[in-house]
A protein has these predicted regions:
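Extracytoplasmic "Venus flytrap"/periplasmic binding protein-like
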Residues: 48, 52-116, 148, 152-153, ...
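Mature extracytoplasmic/periplasmic domains
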Residues: 99-102, 263-267, 299-373
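Conserved C-terminal helix/tail region of periplasmic/extracytoplasmic solute-binding proteins
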Residues: 151, 360-424
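Glycine-centered hinge/linker elements that transmit conformational signals in sensory
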Residues: 170, 209-239
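Extracytoplasmic/periplasmic solute-binding protein
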Residues: 127-136, 141, 165-212, 255
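A structural signal for short loop-to-beta-strand junctions that line the ligand-binding cleft
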Residues: 72-73, 80-81, 110-148, 177-181, ...
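Extracytoplasmic/periplasmic substrate-recognition and gating elements
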Residues: 51-52, 57, 129, 152-153, ...
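Hinge/lid segment of periplasmic solute-binding proteins
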Residues: 86-141, 165, 171, 191-194, ...
Length: 424
């Protein structure tokens, strides 16, 4: 919350966005993106925009450590016009600090897939009227699988938890390792955790906890059970193997499946460029209709309140949201378009296509977790604990640590609740 407080102090004098006219008479619009890996795509988009616009000059920068740079600039009241970040806790903090412009009147907002607009609303600590981000590109996480291995053995993609465990048993009996986990790097523990949680918990679980309507001990109990079940089908001592180890092992055919997001595919293909990889939604439930795809907003654009040229910023956003520009970005970076329309879906995500089309998607639970809480390490510690009360200890700690690291936020949420009740 320290970041929020610091940012909140500087919203009273928004003076940045020095968008005075350039020497050539054009209005300068600056976009800062947190994705250095997309620099080539943005350079191409920037060039195409500037070649087709006489009155606006667009500059898109994608620096390393962009979030640190942005936070420093915000404290100095040196604001870009637009920022391009993910739909996660940073977005929540910046929104809570009242840094973003309401862009509800932007035409492009009407073309965003509803699921992604809903995700952004759930990232609001306190409900706000309006729309404060334009979701652009999303990712998806479930279970990667070796399509050739599946075809050769007649294995079918599972659609329920029972089918999944039965498949794991069948693969194990054939002499092949069903899963690779690679839990040495603690962050990898969050991949199956998130993918299971979206199907087993309400998407607003964290907010419900803040309001006092539930506890993590109650909400996360089935998630804790099922993530532990994965250990029965994985490599011995997965805590000895890193993310790179797991990618390499899966690429070499040492397991049939890998519980990681599609973002791991480039790393896997660097080892085995010809590998035929698929990805399916984690079937967390025994009723397929209850399953939900774990998808989150990887990139979205927000206009800063300090922007002096909202009309020019809107023109930039409308250009960025054209089908052609979105496809330029996706061709370079992959992923899922947040805009409704006929956009190509990578072959590796084809098994998830119906979920995407039907808006059966929910955000990563960890997008709501404060980084100081180190939930990834908590999950790893829980899985290492073989005691009878391991789950109880883990979930009680989850609740107590949540209160510790979100004390101010919980008070803010509950004060808001009381105000709403008093106003009735």
């Amino acid at each position: 919350m320290a970041v929020v407080l610091a940012l909140g102090m500087c919203t009273t004098g928004l003076t940045g966005c020095g968008n005075e006219k350039r020497a050539d008479g054009k209005t300068e619009i600056e976009v800062v993106s947190y994705k250095p890996e997309a620099v080539k795509a943005f350079e191409k988009i920037e060039k195409q925009f500037n070649e087709t616009h006489d009155d606006i000059h667009l500059t898109i920068s994608s620096p390393n450590e962009a979030m640190t740079i942005l936070k420093t600039r915000f404290i100095r009241e040196d604001y870009p016009d637009i920022i391009a970040i993910g739909g996660d806790i940073n977005y929540s903090n910046f929104l809570d600090a009242d840094l973003f412009e309401d862009i509800s009147d932007l035409d492009a907002v009407d073309t965003v897939k509803k699921a992604y607009l809903d995700m952004d609303k759930e990232l609001e600590f306190i409900p706000k009227d309006g729309t404060y981000a334009l979701p652009y590109a999303a990712n998806a996480a479930g279970v990667l699988y070796n399509k050739d291995m599946f075809a050769e053995n007649g294995w079918k993609v599972p659609t329920t938890w029972s089918e999944f465990t039965a498949l794991c048993n069948e693969i194990k009996e054939s002499g092949t390792l069903p899963l690779y986990l690679g839990f040495k790097d603690t962050w990898t523990c969050l991949a199956p955790w998130n993918a299971l949680a979206v199907g087993l918990c309400d998407s607003d679980t964290c907010n419900q906890v803040n309001m006092g309507n539930t506890t993590f001990e109650e909400a996360y109990s089935p998630v804790a059970d099922k993530i532990r079940t994965l250990l029965d089908y994985a490599e011995d001592n997965p805590y000895a193997y890193s993310y790179n180890d797991a990618c390499t092992a899966f690429a070499r055919g040492e397991s049939a499946m890998y519980t990681i997001g599609s973002y791991a595919i480039p790393q896997i293909k660097s080892v085995n460029p010809d590998m035929n990889i698929g990805s399916f939604t984690f079937p967390a439930n025994d009723n397929e209709a209850d399953n939900v795809l774990n998808s989150g907003i990887d990139l979205q654009f927000s206009v800063m309140k300090a922007c002096k040229n909202k009309e020019a910023a809107y023109e930039v956003l409308e250009y960025l949201y054209s089908d052609e520009t979105i496809q330029t970005y996706l061709d370079d970076q992959g992923g899922i378009a947040c805009k409704d329309g006929d956009f190509a879906i990578p072959d590796t995500l084809k098994d998830m296509q119906e979920y995407i089309k039907d808006n059966r998607m929910s955000d990563y639970q960890d997008h709501h977790y404060p980084s100081e809480m180190s939930v990834d390490a908590m999950i790893q510690t829980y899985l290492l604990d073989t005691g009878d009360n391991a789950k109880e200890k883990f979930l009680k700690k989850f609740d107590s640590d949540w209160k510790r690291y979100n004390r101010d936020l919980i008070r803010e949420v509950q004060d808001y609740q009381k105000e709403q009740e008093d106003a009735k």
